[in-house]
């Protein structure tokens, strides 16, 4: 799959950081890339930057992963325009010091990082077939995570680590369970830890919190392109064409937490997620 001519792909969180690096890499290989962005302004800026360098087949489409109605509308638009989806890279991420909620009343980190991508992916499955690939950008933070089934929206004892690690563990569990459910279809789904990447994800746009810390630590971070390398590998490389349900780091299978390997927890989370996104 190294030549992606005629391949149609979607990248979420496509306007900056690893998402933008992923769009660049896939389009460089010839793919048509649908750029899913929440902000039209930031999306247009990224699109102009990417198409200013060279001719690329890019399609900017606006969608808020924290709004189920917006996701359903996006999927309807995609299906009206494209006959199939060959690659889906669920890259968008959100992190916040204070507890916030999505438009649907879900704790925002779980709502965007997991549920938004869960709904997007499951709605697009009927446009995928043998050879299609799904890549979920997870994080090593899943290793300290736990799924709080009795308080999934973290109304009690919220803190940023608890919320973020829960959402990232959900990414790994979703990958495992979906891989089981897709067995025999030829569609693969894998996830990865990108490493420590200097992106704007941790920066609160209102207060600027995180900018100083990010600035000080920037020399120790990976670039967005380096961080995106494993997701791009999973989306395109022949070496992983028959691997599904894996957790990768630096383009290799990596060790994930004990909790992330529980079939019972994965199945329970999948069923809860279906229930939470139901219209």
Protein language model annotation of sequence segments:
Residues 167, 191, 214-255, 261-271:
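C-terminal helical subdomain
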Residues 42, 205-208, 265:
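Short acidic-hydrophobic sequence patches enriched in Asp/Glu that either
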Residues 198-215:
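A glycine/serine/threonine-rich, flexible loop-to-helix segment
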Residues 53, 208-209, 248-250:
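A short glycine/small-residue-enriched secondary-structure motif
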Residues 154-158, 213, 253:
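Short glycine/proline-rich turn/loop motifs
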Residues 107, 150, 210, 214, ...:
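Generic detector of well-ordered alpha-helical segments enriched in charged/polar residues
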Residues 1-203, 276-279:
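Rossmann-fold NAD(P)H-dependent dehydrogenase/reductase core
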């Amino acid at each position: 799959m190294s030549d992606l001519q005629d391949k149609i792909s979607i990248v979420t969180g496509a306007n900056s950081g690893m998402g933008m690096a992923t769009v660049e890499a896939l389009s460089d290989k010839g793919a048509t890339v649908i750029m899913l962005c929440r902000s039209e302004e930031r999306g247009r800026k990224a699109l102009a930057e990417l198409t200013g360098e060279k001719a690329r087949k890019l399609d900017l489409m606006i969608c808020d992963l924290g709004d189920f109605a917006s996701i359903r509308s996006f999927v309807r638009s995609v299906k009206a325009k494209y006959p199939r989806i060959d690659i889906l890279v669920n890259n968008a991420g959100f992190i916040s010091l204070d507890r916030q909620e999505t438009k649907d009343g879900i704790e925002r980190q779980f709502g965007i990082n997991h549920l938004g991508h869960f709904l997007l992916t499951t709605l697009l499955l009927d446009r995928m077939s043998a050879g299609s690939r799904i890549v979920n950008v997870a994080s090593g933070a899943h290793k300290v995570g736990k799924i709080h089934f009795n308080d999934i929206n973290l109304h009690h004892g919220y803190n940023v680590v608890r919320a973020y690690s829960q959402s990232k563990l959900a990414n790994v569990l979703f990958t495992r369970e979906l891989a089981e459910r897709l067995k025999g279809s030829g569609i693969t789904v894998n996830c990865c830890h990108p490493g420590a990447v200097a992106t704007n994800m941790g920066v609160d746009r209102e207060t600027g919190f995180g900018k100083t810390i990010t600035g000080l630590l920037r020399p120790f971070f990976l670039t967005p392109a380096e961080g995106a390398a494993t997701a791009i590998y999973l989306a395109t490389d022949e070496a992983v064409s028959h691997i599904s349900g894996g957790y990768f780091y630096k383009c290799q299978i990596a060790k994930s937490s004990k909790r992330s390997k529980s079939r019972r927890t994965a199945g329970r989370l999948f069923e809860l997620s279906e229930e939470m996104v139901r219209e």
